[in-house]
Amino acid sequence: MKNKVQLITYADRLGDGTIKSMTDILRTRFDGVYDGVHILPFFTPFDGADAGFDPIDHTKVDERLGSWDDVAELSKTHNIMVDAIVNHMSWESKQFQDVLAKGEESEYYPMFLTMSSVFPNGATEEDLAGIYRPRPGLPFTHYKFAGKTRLVWVSFTPQQVDIDTDSDKGWEYLMSIFDQMAASHVSYIRLDAVGYGAKEAGTSCFMTPKTFKLISRLREEGVKRGLEILIEVHSYYKKQVEIASKVDRVYDFALPPLLLHALSTGHVEPVAHWTDIRPNNAVTVLDTHDGIGVIDIGSDQLDRSLKGLVPDEDVDNLVNTIHANTHGESQAATGAAASNLDLYQVNSTYYSALGCNDQHYIAARAVQFFLPGVPQVYYVGALAGKNDMELLRKTNNGRDINRHYYSTAEIDENLKRPVVKALNALAKFRNELDAFDGTFSYTTDDDTSISFTWRGETSQATLTFEPKRGLGVDNTTPVAMLEWEDSAGDHRSDDLIANPPVVA
């Protein structure tokens, strides 16, 4: 994976809502800013029950968005990442509809999981209570197979039916996705919800040894096709470290809440500790199409005796701080307040979660860009977007608070804002300075500040992050300072917004 900043976006939420329009915006408005792009699901349909993450046909581009030819055209200028939704597919898919009609006589019957296929001898209360699920309740819903009511496994929503990845039909389906991606000039595949993709009686059915075998198998198939694999798993931080040794790339989901914690408390020790132990083969993010995963810095959800990167009371306080910073907007979009019950996420844009404080926001981005890994910026974050309460009220889907539709005119207007200009400059700096391909080190000054340094053959750069200097959402004091050396000499910026860095 190229060591350059990437964008995460939906195909339909930048410009006129097509892949061609998105491509034009990337090539013009963000030229030199984003080298690669993760296009969130654009399959048929892209606007289903979970915004494309419940595909009816995972191998077809929704014709309302464009075609595979449009994807291939984009690949001429940008490396492309695409999702492979490993755990489930839409109940409206031809395969599941065939099972509904024919029951066990359907050729696709083995492809889908029922309670009895995982628990052929029945399940005890302990078995069922031990299943980990990111939603309340048990992971089953009623469907009729040829008139007979069955309990179908659904890890997420009733419309997203789980695939039996052990079955021949299930595996053939997943490989058909890999084949299509390889044929369409895709460079990277993100394995969505893979942590739930291997079911086994008597286990939590989440990130078990069987899951790691599935991940290894998928990775092998990716290598055969020239596809680099990225794993998407929200879990206890030690599991993230363990996963990283088994895959090409893993998300650093602990970073977003850790930086929110540092900026609200002034304490950098948790960030320093994470810097010391985190995997370097990471994709770093502050925001994604999902909420902010506070679970990733707390204690293990399956064993509370395993402590997190911060105490659980700090996690609770952080959630309350985000709600306060957003004036209750995130609270209206999180948990039982909205239709999608996310037990481990707070729904808000990252900019709003910081109380729309420009200095805090650019400092968080700077730390993200300085930590080892490939940085990705979500399209709403790329424009320092605020919570979309109008869309939330329209859909009552909590995550939609962070899924705004930007017209081209709106994009152009936001590009004039100083904080967005500063972010674009910072991304270009990250892409152009060769020090970021060199060696990394960090130092701390007690619990007050942390400095990150990169040294290359012809350049070097040091970012100092000192959140205590600007505590409070209304405090406009800069909390990040940057020093760098390039071919033109030594440079320094004490305010990344007023004086953004430029590589000579």
From Swiss-Prot:
Key words, A-Z: Carbohydrate metabolism, Glycosyltransferase, Transferase
SUPFAM superfamilies: (Trans)glycosidases, Glycosyl hydrolase domain
Protein residues bound to substrate: D50
Active site: D192, E232
Biological process per Gene Ontology, one example term: carbohydrate metabolic process
Enzyme class: transferase
Assigned EC number: 2.4.1.7
Superkingdom to which the source organism belongs: Bacteria
Residues at which sucrose binds: H88, R190, L191, D192, E232, H289, D290, D342, L343, Y344, Q345, R399
Comment on pH dependence: Optimum pH is 6.0-6.5 for the phosphorolysis of sucrose.
A single MF term (Gene Ontology): sucrose phosphorylase activity
Catalytic temperature dependence: Optimum temperature is 48 degrees Celsius for the phosphorolysis of sucrose. The His-tagged enzyme shows an optimum temperature of 58 degrees Celsius. The immobilization of the enzyme on Sepabeads EC-HFA increases thermostability, and optimum temperature is shifted to 65 degrees Celsius.
Family: Belongs to the glycosyl hydrolase 13 family. Sucrose phosphorylase subfamily.
PANTHER family linked to this entry: SUCROSE PHOSPHORYLASE
Known role: Catalyzes the reversible phosphorolysis of sucrose into alpha-D-glucose 1-phosphate (Glc1P) and D-fructose. Is involved in sucrose degradation. Also displays transglucosylation activity in vitro, by transferring the glucosyl moiety of Glc1P to a broad range of monomeric sugars, such as D- and L-arabinose, D- and L-arabitol, and xylitol.
Name of the protein in its database record: Sucrose phosphorylase
Encoding gene per record: sucP
